[in-house]
């Protein structure tokens, strides 16, 4: 399945939870989910009973849409998570949180992961001083993520950093908002990652 490029707020209404696909609109209370908290379509207000398989599939789809990854990428992350020692679901969350585009989002340089991915692919970032434009790059603890000098006055980046006063920052990153760089200090603990996803159901789905 290719990455979804349609109206993102319909996705949130479909699942009935905020996936922060429209960051500033959500903070302002203007998201489509808040205005119409039911699924899109003629019969959207009558949510159907979902089977066990349907619940598992929904959790996978939610995670994919929220992090902006394709089916191929997501399955590869699961295979890696299963190969590692420890809880497969926790490993999966840790691995996806290490994606460069997600780390940029967690550092507050972007209000959404979609914009964070654009910053990466358009070459606005340096990782340990070197230009890197691969959103799926796996960031390691101690690495420095920096906005390139020519992009430091980008109005969307400046605005995103201003909004971190409302949203806060992930405890596993440190940033210097004035110099526009951050350090991925450590891997997150599972309980620190607040996402509307039950990864246990994803593991059950892929393990069939």
Curated annotation (Swiss-Prot):
GO terms for cellular component: small ribosomal subunit. GO terms for molecular function: rRNA binding; structural constituent of ribosome. Keywords: Ribonucleoprotein, Ribosomal protein, RNA-binding, rRNA-binding. The keyword RNA-binding applies. Coiled coil: none annotated. GO terms for biological process: ribosomal small subunit biogenesis; translation. Residues 98-160 form the S4 RNA-binding domain. The keyword Thylakoid does not apply. InterPro entries: Ribosomal_uS4, Ribosomal_uS4_bac-type, Ribosomal_uS4_CS, Ribosomal_uS4_N, S4_RNA-bd, S4_RNA-bd_sf. SMART domains: Ribosomal_S4, S4. It holds the Pfam family S4. One of the primary rRNA binding proteins, it binds directly to 16S rRNA where it nucleates assembly of the body of the 30S subunit. Part of the 30S ribosomal subunit. Contacts protein S5. The interaction surface between S4 and S5 is involved in control of translational fidelity. HAMAP family: Ribosomal_uS4_B. Belongs to the universal ribosomal protein uS4 family. NCBIfam families: PRK05327.1, rpsD_bact. This is Small ribosomal subunit protein uS4. The gene is rpsD.
